[in-house]
Amino acid sequence: MANPKLTRVLSTRDRVQDTLSAHRNELVALLSRYVDQGKGILQPHNLIDELESVIGDDETKKSLSDGPFGEILKSAMEAIVVPPFVALAVRPRPGVWEYVRVNVFELSVEQLTVSEYLRFKEELVDGPNSDPFCLELDFEPFNANVPRPSRSSSIGNGVQFLNRHLSSVMFRNKDCLEPLLDFLRVHKYKGHPLMLNDRIQSISRLQIQLSKAEDHISKLSQETPFSEFEYALQGMGFEKGWGDTAGRVLEMMHLLSDILQAPDPSSLEKFLGMVPMVFNVVILSPHGYFGQANVLGLPDTGGQVVYILDQVRALETEMLLRIKRQGLDISPSILIVTRLIPDAKGTTCNQRLERVSGTEHTHILRVPFRSEKGILRKWISRFDVWPYLENYAQDAASEIVGELQGVPDFIIGNYSDGNLVASLMAHRMGVTQCTIAHALEKTKYPDSDIYWKDFDNKYHFSCQFTADLIAMNNADFIITSTYQEIAGTKNTVGQYESHGAFTLPGLYRVVHGIDVFDPKFNIVSPGADMTIYFPYSEETRRLTALHGSIEEMLYSPDQTDEHVGTLSDRSKPILFSMARLDKVKNISGLVEMYSKNTKLRELVNLVVIAGNIDVNKSKDREEIVEIEKMHNLMKNYKLDGQFRWITAQTNRARNGELYRYIADTRGAFAQPAFYEAFGLTVVEAMTCGLPTFATCHGGPAEIIEHGLSGFHIDPYHPEQAGNIMADFFERCKEDPNHWKKVSDAGLQRIYERYTWKIYSERLMTLAGVYGFWKYVSKLERRETRRYLEMFYILKFRDLVKTVPSTADD
């Protein structure tokens, strides 16, 4: 048998060079077309469109398109053109980048480093004479000793990877078990020791005492309360925190014995998740009007408020359950720290402390924005908060310590402002920090980094992008709702991934900002509030008293500012959608798709809840365009009798029952957005048992298993999407069980992956594992924090000075 040959993997530069040799004329023609467009940035579709139009015969076209250079173009995320050069940013797979530059006149090819590529890109703004002494940010050296996976499929599973690494290190070197002993010995609550006392000073002693304790407890009934053998364990070196019954104490001691003998990832994660570490949690969300009533729809106030209120209710329930099982008599505390707004617009945002309904130990703590002129009384945009955050962090820290009678155990930041304040607090207090971005603005505004000066007067992105970099690198762990939020898809760049390398010309150049392979990334998806969103089949819980108002909303013949259009055949199922009325959410696209699909119009009625109906009531330019488009569609396609348009609804309880009412009609939910970061309405609808059709662009593609628990639709191919919907309803007409089959599969998917219970369990476990990792990797973290501290003081604070303070008058 012949020996297999080793072949060299060609670099991007080599592949371009080879294509130049094989298809010189075609490639020169193509690259010349790029150069002829002049200086600028070309997007992926521009690159492919030119490829399609430049080539002559089909054979040559196929050879070039399917060859090495064609593959490079298909994986290029952008091209920078500065004649006679064309530079490509090539992304072979999520998280992996290469850069190459071609001189079209000389036909020379060179591989570029990240720094060289960004410097070339800066020529779009600064010309060829940019400052050679530009500040470059590079966090890679600080993470050299941090283990990380190499496969793109491992991104977002950081805790699993970290557990494998930690258990492997412990298995290979028993000396590495010492930090675990130290970690257990430092646990105290208000000065009282938990887990271990001074009688256990070494690993060998711990193993001996564990064996004695297990022997003692195994003779007891599993239900024996901890108090009945507490003093016996204390004499052996064990304090409270192991469990409330003999059975739970024994389970936890077995886990620790197994770890000391032969560490494995699942045992380590389970054990660290059971260690009592988190009693006081602080959640930061400074901007907007944060309240429990009359706030949704106010500026900068929406999904983040709903997310946090649902989050804390689930988190408190999980904390109480864990504390009880740990055998502790401790009341947890959760503080949502937000801004106090004296001019509160009829909300409770001027109250310092407010208990969260449905909880016993969770409060909203409001702290005002303060400057040298005094307290700021009015709301300000989230883009203008930067001058206030440093003082706010100090003031809020004092208020928090006063409320908790000590420092918190765990801090969670939300959005750019909350994450920066969380970073300042966590750095000062030395506690575990979790970051939740919700949205990273850099990805929402194309080219807002390279052309930051064009945006800065209005949005102050130089401050925001800098704050985001500081927070994501300071955080002990980051949670996202989807994989795509971290690393995108094969054809799109992830929100965090876009912060790996970018430049703000004249300010600084980021050559290694964040690594999406970092094990700090974890996907922890939220759910729907199951007190509001529950299956249509749970008849005893149904809010039947609301059915009258729901029927009025759906079927009333009156045409008002609240609803237009009528449904003449009430026996038809309802295809339902609910979203903001803007271009991205694409509600008008759904209406147009329905309008043009005769078969779908025969099978179902369409109901949408979106925005304003009266154009005079809207101040949003994008919404105004969509309102006019909706009215034109109704008129041009004669939709009256089959279509109902209802204005935006903020009553969540009624919205929950509305989903179930739609399910009673054997209807379905549609989410037609061009892009949806997560898709909370998709989760809400599926939780109520509604079969769901949702965009394949973004989070819903991960929520729904196509053809099983719902259906993916592509809003860029509306005819195909309409046919998928029509086929479903036609099949349901022939086989009524098909509707229930999809409904049940959707519910099963939710219960397995998308509930607040799963979320809170996971979050608490992550707090334990990363708390331990923070403890055992102090030195590496200290180096990173010093670098961040310097960047904050020398760069961020100067940028903040460029943001004008807001006046109350």
UniProtKB/Swiss-Prot annotation:
* Catalytic activities: an NDP-alpha-D-glucose + D-fructose = a ribonucleoside 5'-diphosphate + sucrose + H(+)
What are the boundaries of the region GT-B glycosyltransferase? 277-755
Q: What induces it?
A: By drought stress. By mannitol, an osmotic agent. Positively regulated by LEC2.
Q: Single GO molecular-function term?
A: sucrose synthase activity
Keyword vocabulary terms for this entry: Glycosyltransferase, Stress response, Transferase
UniProt EC number: 2.4.1.13
List the transmembrane segments: none
**Entry comment describing in which tissues the protein is expressed:** Detected in the whole plant with highest expression in developing siliques, vasculature of cotyledons and stomatal guard cells. Also detected throughout the mature parts of the root but not in the expanding zone.
- UniProt note: pH dependence: Optimum pH is 6.0-7.0 for degradative reaction. Optimum pH is 7.0 for synthetic reaction. Optimum pH is 9.0-9.5 for synthetic reaction.
Q: Which InterPro entries match?
A: Glyco_trans_1, Sucrose_synth_GT-B1, Sucrose_synthase_pln/cyn, SUS_EPBD, SUS_N
Highest taxon in the source lineage = Eukaryota
Q: Name one GO biological process term.
A: response to mannitol
Q: What role does this protein play?
A: Sucrose-cleaving enzyme that provides UDP-glucose and fructose for various metabolic pathways. Modulates metabolic homeostasis and direct carbon towards starch synthesis in developing seeds.
Family recorded in the similarity comment: Belongs to the glycosyltransferase 1 family. Plant sucrose synthase subfamily.
Protein name in UniProt: Sucrose synthase 3
- Per the UniProt entry, what species is this protein from, by scientific name? Arabidopsis thaliana
